[in-house]
């Protein structure tokens, strides 16, 4: 999926392939931890042609995840985030200018970069995945011990 570059971030964002790691490296990163908190937020989106609204919803979802994770880390639950999209802490990503990542401890990759099939994950967690009644869910995870 990532190599299709539908989001435009392949090779230009540290959090995205090929820079974030191989599929096996990403899988091992998750499997090295014992727990995962799966989080879903729901957004009213009239239709998928509203790309600005979709981007804003993903951004707000990821921002909410980062706020939650800050609290979890403060309580001693060290881990990492998997977002609804690739990292957007710096716009553009420092990779575009050949600079080092400014936030390596906060950078997050998307579910696709981890080869996570979100529909199956949602079903396994008994969570709604489907877009219906103009409500679109976004998913994220916090992986920790």
Across the structure, where does each feature detected by a protein language model lie?
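Catalytic cores of enzyme domains
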Residues: 1-13, 17-145
């Amino acid at each position: 999926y990532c190599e299709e570059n539908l989001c435009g971030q392949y090779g230009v964002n540290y959090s995205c392939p090929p820079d974030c790691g191989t599929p096996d490296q990403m899988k091992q990163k998750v499997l090295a931890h014992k727990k995962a908190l799966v989080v879903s937020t729901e957004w009213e989106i009239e239709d998928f042609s509203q790309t600005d609204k979709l981007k804003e919803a993903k951004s707000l979802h990821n921002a909410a995840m980062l706020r939650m994770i800050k609290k979890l880390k403060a309580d001693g639950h060290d881990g990492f985030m998997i977002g609804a999209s690739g990292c957007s802490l710096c716009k553009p990503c420092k990779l575009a200018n050949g600079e080092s990542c400014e936030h390596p401890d906060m950078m997050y990759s998307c579910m696709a970069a981890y080869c996570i099939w979100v529909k199956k994950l949602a079903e396994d967690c008994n969570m709604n995945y489907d877009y219906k009644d103009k409500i679109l869910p976004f998913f994220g995870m916090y992986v920790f011990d």
